[in-house]
Structures are given as structure tokens and as C-alpha cells.
Amino acid sequence: MVSERGLDVLRVIVQDYVSSREPVGSKSIVERHAFGVSAATIRNDMALLEEEELIAAPHTSSGRVPTDKGYRLFVDQLADVRPLTPAQRQAIHVFLGESVDLDDVLARTVRLLAQLTNQVALVQYPSLATSHVKHVELVALSTTRVLTVLITDTGRVEQRVVELAGDPDDAFLAVMRTRINQAVGGLGLAEAATRLETLSDEVEPAQRAAASVLAGTLVEQVLANRQERLLLAGSANLARTERDFPGSISPVLEAIEEQVVLLRLLGEMEADQHGVSVSIGRENAPFGLGETSVLTSGYSSSGGVLARLGVLGPTRMDYSTNMASVRAVARYLSRLLEER
């Protein structure tokens, strides 16, 4: 059991090590922090922390550094995360507020998060398990070419140009537009794909061929939207922190290239009392990321969590500030999507 002062000692060790990248000794703790006790007393506290495997001694230093277990206790004991500065909040508001559609806002979000935290930023596209067809539009481009537009309730837009035999007129497109929206509006993507496959059977025989082509194209668009997607930015930030990885940084770079692995990791993370999920060091080993920490938060457009965003970096990171950035960006993104 770690005492209250022991927790305070662990806290300053984490903060000082994150700030300096140098092992922390009892003398520097006494000099820099107002504990009101001797260096010998702090050494005893540090010895107890080491027995609990919360800190460890690098082989060339008399100071101590936090372990994965120490970082975990530090994060779990955070009373609150450090608030963003007014300038940071304004940057989020301005940069994301200029976006024009879902693709643009998510691309801006991942770049902004990488800049705010100096870590690798991750933004998952809205969860397909909760996506539904909002609207389908058919636009005549010429006498034989039609633009099909699929819009989901999560803001994703998929467009295709299709060639139709014959000469489909505006009346035909109006009828098909109405039939399609009545058939699949509000349906989940999987259910919508199944429904579209039978839609051409319900039109007049003379229009069936064109209807079949339109329905088939829309099925392809629905299935394309069922693919999970993840945006990344800031991979160069890992290179600047290469010293924080005891081994080679290559396995980490290889792991973040595997979107399936990252999506599985995000799917297993749950938020704590601060609204942010934190997975540290060895907790990420099954995903090939045992030397990293991952911080994520969910975002939504109408109350339910649609997807997650976050950052990935070395275990030696400023958890409080990065958690605040992740949480603030997720909250602003949710508000932005709800307004659209």
C-alpha cells in the first residue's frame, strides 16, 4: 500500500522525468518540491515505490524513472486534467470550424490533434455499426450518365457516376429517387444493401434494366461505406522521441501502419472518469505497441458514441495535457457534427 506522501513522490517523479527525460533523485526532489522532509526520508519513500515496482533505476543512474505500473497509478490518481489555454481552445474552434464536410473535418481534426500534443494522432471514421442511410440523391449529368449520392446519418458521403442504357428522363429519376429513399431511408447499411438488391424487381419491366444498374451501384456505395477507416497524422513526432523507446522504433512504426490492429485496440478501450481512455505500455503489448501509451476519447453526432479519436506516443508523455487535448477536441468535434 502506497502512502499519501508516496503518491506525491511518485507524482513529482513522473512530472520531472517527463519534463527533463533525466532520472530523478531524492536530492532534486527535495530541492525542487516543498515536501518539508529530508532527502533521506524521500529516499525511503522511493525505496518503497521501487519495491512496489512503480519506479526503477536505469543501469547507469542513481536516479529513478517511472515504470509502466507507475505511470498507470499516476494516471489513475489524477484528480483532474490540466485545462487547455484560451489560445488552444480558440485554435480548435477556428481550425475545425472552417471545415466543409465530414472528410474535411476529420482530416483537420487529426492534424490539429497531432499539433496540439506532438504525438501521433488517430481519428476513426464514424462507427459503421451505428450508421444509417440518411438520403440518396440521383442527379442527371447527361442523357446517359447519372450521379448517385449516398449520404449517411454520420455525415459520410459516397458519390458514383453510372452509365445507363437508353435515355432515362427526369421523370424516371424522380420515381427512382422516391422509391429508393422510401425503401432504404433510415436503414442500417447492411440492411440497406439487402433491400436494394430486390428493388429493381418492383419497377416497370421497361425500366428494370436501368433500375438494376442504379441499385447495383448504390449497393457498392453502401458496402464501400461499411469499411472501417482510420486517419493518422504526426508520425514524424515519433522520430523526435526515438530516445524514449528502449529498443528499435521500427516495430512501433510497423504497428501503426496496420489499421486493423489499431481499430481493434481502439475498440477495446473504455473511458475513465475524465472521459478519456488511457492504455499504457505493456497493456498494449498484444497489439505490438508495448512501448507506447494510447489516449482516446469517443465522439458522437447525436448522443451515442460513433467513433474514437486520440493520440499514441512513448510512455514518457505529458498525460494530463494530452488527456485535456484529446477530451477537448472530441467534445468540440461532437458539437460540430451535431450542428450539421
UniProtKB/Swiss-Prot annotation:
Pfam families xrefs: HrcA
Listed GO biological process terms: negative regulation of DNA-templated transcription
Keyword entries, A-Z: Repressor, Stress response, Transcription, Transcription regulation
GO molecular function, one term: DNA binding
InterPro entries from the UniProt entry: GAF-like_dom_sf (IPR029016), HrcA (IPR002571), HrcA_C (IPR021153), WH-like_DNA-bd_sf (IPR036388), WH_DNA-bd_sf (IPR036390), WHTH_transcript_rep_HrcA_IDD (IPR023120)
Family, as annotated: Belongs to the HrcA family.
Function statement: Negative regulator of class I heat shock genes (grpE-dnaK-dnaJ and groELS operons). Prevents heat-shock induction of these operons.
Name the UniProt record assigns to this protein: Heat-inducible transcription repressor HrcA
Organism of provenance: Clavibacter michiganensis subsp. michiganensis (strain NCPPB 382)
